[in-house]
Amino acid sequence: MSIIFHEGSKTFHLFNEEISYIICVLSNGHIGNLYFGKKIHDREGFSYLIESKQRPMTACVYEGNRKYSLEHLKLEYPVYGTSDYRNPAVEILQENGSRISEFKYISHEITDGKPELAGLPATYVEEPEEAQTLCLRLKDEVTGIVLELLYSIFSGKGILARSARFINEGIAPVHLLNAMSLSLDLPDSDYVWMQFSGVWARERHIIERKLEQGIQAVGSIRGNSSHEHNPFIVLRRPSTTETSGEVMGFSLIYSGNHRMQAEVDTHNTTRVTTGINPQNFDWKLDCGESFQTPEAVVVFSNQGLNGMSQTFHKLYQKRLVRGYWRDRPRPVLNNNWEATYFDFTEDRLVEIAAKAKECGVELFVLDDGWFGKRSNDYTGLGDWVANKERLPFGIKGLADRIEEMGMKFGLWFEPEMVNKDSDLYRAHPDWILHAPQRASCHGRNQYVLDFSRKEVVDCIYDMMYKILSESKISYIKWDMNRSITECYSVALPADRQGEVFHRYILGVYDLYERLTTAFPQILFESCASGGGRFDPGMLYYAPQGWISDDTDAAERVRIQYGTSMCYPISSMGSHVSVVPNHQLNRITSLHTRANVAYFGTFGYELDLNKLTDEEIAEVKAQIIFMKEYRELIQFGNFYRLKSPFDGNETVWMTVSEDKRKALVFWYRERNVVNAEFTRVRLQGLDPDLIYKNEYNGTENYGDELMNLGLLTTDVTAGEPTNEDLPCTDYESRIYVLTAE
């Protein structure tokens, strides 16, 4: 790993064992991008990569020079309005109404390690030798705005982290209207665009299309990263598969409004930009003030989609997630929500918890309904004090009873929301986001607290701190059950209303940081009606997230498959729920529900007292299995083998670091009569080790399993005679492979 500056050619070469990233100072002082991809040899200069030719109908920078136009150069952080007609990375409104900027190189600094981003989540290092950072310092002489571009390259992996910082060293305030975290110009457009989109209960489905001339973009203006479009996109070559070929993944470490975009120009070059969504963004930068963008991470792999995903998994597991729970297997939990909804008493909860303890559950979680006058979703939000009618001895009394059983206790909060029927709202009706003289929309009968205001965040912190400090609480589920509307703060002046969305999410991060600092051993799980704010920004504070409110096993296969493109298995909240499923009314077998839920944090979303003795025996066996293999599942090397978006079967697997153990998950959506035999080539095994398949007792070398494949499909002849695999839909199996 190294960052080299060639003074003569003013070229920077950032490289490690896998990638090279080459940029240079162009003749006009702008920064140009020359190359990003597989590692290449270093040399004094790469000027031959600067493509500057005369073209018709082009605006040119220099008098008398018809070859130098920004429109046809690959730029590193393009500006608005000076001969580049593609979308810019930055747009600044000045006092005179101009939006023209010209940032030119003035200096740079190369340091070991990686700096923190004040008030924002970001990847980190524990030792300086893990990364090097380049800070390019540019300046717009007219406004006095200084732009710092940060690049951190990590040792050993194809990872580059980028962000930008603006400092107003001028004599007048300006307004940032657009400030991307990353802009990357690529020399061609021969890519397939992949996005991870959906809706509530159907998040992160894979959508693909070939890049064409024009703009392809996804984003959010909901105040959260959204169910609809995750802040993650992929560009892969058309021939790239899960196991081979070039691919780039772009991930934004941010939980608010975002935009992920690829623009192909008329000469088929591609510009990728990621960052805060410029819609409804307007940040006033007074003299002496600075603004830091969120961090974007780009990963390059020439080992296919699995190679890219594994790089993201390891980075986010080890250098984004922090604290006590980073490297610890997650406890098996039982959440009461789908078992009781709002209809519970303390004794009923203890009854559910007792059965869970009997089955081997380690953590009991009390969900919504424990506070204020919360008997439905119309009342109580914001009043974070125990409802003594339901919990006569408060949260402490219930937590003590759960602890006495030998289990840990967890609790649900929705800190950012309030009901109008609450003491908090009655005391502070101006604490919600709302536009004066206009009606306010509600979602789930609730309103959004103005977390851009410190006094609001302080109040919620004080209430949560009191509960957490007085009771034995080991886990917090932090929910957000609506998106933001009427994004206006009565505490800010008119010329700062464009800051509210970003200030809001900074307030959320501040509350998370204060709570995780005060209670470092509490396991936080983020949630937003399921997967509405499942993003890297949340992982910095909460090591795991509830990826979807849909707990149906068949739907979860698709959701978990898409989610795994970027996010590690240890981050995915996944539970076994009742049937018929509460979201789809679908019935799937208990073993399939568990087989799918294993590949996440694992738990139960039901009242185990309502299961039969046979089902209880199965649950006990499931929990024993999960406890034995959860470290392998949550922290092993994960491979996708067959996609649910491509056919009737889904296969994925996880392999231990020493390659001596592997679990293979096989799932069949629909039963097929008289089907062909199918084999799946496994990945990541040691070719020279012999693996015993615990399902059928067969033994095979790793190279056999990776080249000949594992036989997964039994043949159904039309009669229910196959004892190994029931002749039903939604069937699954786990293969345990152990090296002899």
Identify the meaning behind each predicted range.
Residues N419-D458, H502-N609:
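Glycan-recognition surfaces
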Residues I233, E242, P644-P687:
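Carbohydrate-binding surface patches
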Residues F5, S9-H13, E17, I31-E263, ...:
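Polysaccharide-binding surfaces and accessory modules of carbohydrate-active proteins
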Residues S98-Y105, W283-N302, Y730-L737:
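Short Pro-Gly-centered flexible turn/kink motifs
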Residues E18, A164, G288, N334, ...:
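Conserved, mostly hydrophobic/aromatic
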